[in-house]
Amino acid sequence: MSQALTLARPYARAAFAIACEKGKCMQWSQALTFSAQVANNPIAATLLSHPQLDHEQAAALLSPEGADPAYVRFLEVIAEAHRLDVLLQVAGLYEKLRAEAEHVIKAKITSAIELAPNELNNIVTALKKRFDCEIEVTTGVDHSLIGGAVIDTGNVVIDGSIKSKLTRLQASLTH
């Protein structure tokens, strides 16, 4: 996995630089997501690995309809280097670069029960204040947390769950 990320990083940076230069960051984001999904489809992966398929045909297969010609050329370069297997990682890294550039943090909030809209708004407001940027939130429910919530922003995890508090209490009592 880490090798795939290492291989994908320069492609993601190049894609982001080209897309931003052309003012098409969102279009490339959508195109990369599409291409990564196609490349990870088992049937498409078999077709893409066929020895008679050249890099231009592979790029055409992976490109969404109406894709930017520079994007198609980008896919041709990846296909020519035999790196189509890292497209999923390229797409993920591209999204991180785009979020950083747009000053957006993606936060996953997992709670023991479904959060009420006002509770979610309070959490988002606190996160905006703490990180001084916009927050894109996804929510989830994990009943094993007993109560409270866990907020994961990728770089920072804030664990305010009852489960973790009980675990810490148990650890302090046994030591």
UniProtKB/Swiss-Prot annotation:
Xref: SUPFAM superfamilies: N-terminal domain of the delta subunit of the F1F0-ATP synthase
Main localization of the protein described in the UniProt heading: membrane
Cellular localisation: Cell inner membrane
Single GO MF annotation: proton-transporting ATP synthase activity, rotational mechanism
Keyword set includes Ion transport: yes
Keyword check for Membrane: yes
Key words, A-Z: ATP synthesis, Cell inner membrane, Cell membrane, CF(1), Hydrogen ion transport, Ion transport, Membrane, Transport
A single Gene Ontology CC term: plasma membrane
Membrane topology type: Peripheral membrane protein
InterPro entries per record: ATP_synth_OSCP/delta_N_sf (IPR026015), ATPase_OSCP/dsu (IPR000711)
Complex formation: F-type ATPases have 2 components, F(1) - the catalytic core - and F(0) - the membrane proton channel. F(1) has five subunits: alpha(3), beta(3), gamma(1), delta(1), epsilon(1). F(0) has three main subunits: a(1), b(2) and c(10-14). The alpha and beta chains form an alternating ring which encloses part of the gamma chain. F(1) is attached to F(0) by a central stalk formed by the gamma and epsilon chains, while a peripheral stalk is formed by the delta and b chains.
The family this protein is said to belong to: Belongs to the ATPase delta chain family.
Role: F(1)F(0) ATP synthase produces ATP from ADP in the presence of a proton or sodium gradient. F-type ATPases consist of two structural domains, F(1) containing the extramembraneous catalytic core and F(0) containing the membrane proton channel, linked together by a central stalk and a peripheral stalk. During catalysis, ATP synthesis in the catalytic domain of F(1) is coupled via a rotary mechanism of the central stalk subunits to proton translocation. This protein is part of the stalk that links CF(0) to CF(1). It either transmits conformational changes from CF(0) to CF(1) or is implicated in proton conduction.
HAMAP family recorded: ATP_synth_delta_bact
Protein name per its UniProtKB record: ATP synthase subunit delta
Organism expressing this protein natively: Xylella fastidiosa (strain M12)
Source taxonomy: Bacteria, Pseudomonadati, Pseudomonadota, Gammaproteobacteria, Lysobacterales
The gene coding this protein: atpH
